[in-house]
Amino acid sequence: AVVSKEVDYGVLMCGTGIGISIAANKVPGVIAAVCSEPYSAKLTKQHNNANIIAFGARVVGSELAKMILDEFFGAEFEGGRHQRRVDMIREIENR
């Protein structure tokens, strides 16, 4: 749904968030990041233009999960110097 633009962002969970993020990043067009705290959630959107956030149900409690999601959904991609990195990721996907 994220790749087809039916939705803007996705949220994935597994035990640690690691396995599901690895699997999600195999899908062309997805930039998924595991975040266990709010600061990383904000920066992965601002600097990496992540469109999926993943976290671990065994790692993150419900209140912390809400804080993480608030930061992720409230952040905007900054572009600029970060656009080069995103372009490199997209180039690798297209190989």
What annotation goes with each model-predicted range?
Residues 38-95:
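C-terminal binding/interaction regions
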Residues 1-9:
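Short alpha-helical segments enriched in small residues
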Residues 12-58:
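Mid-chain, well-packed structural core segment of small domains
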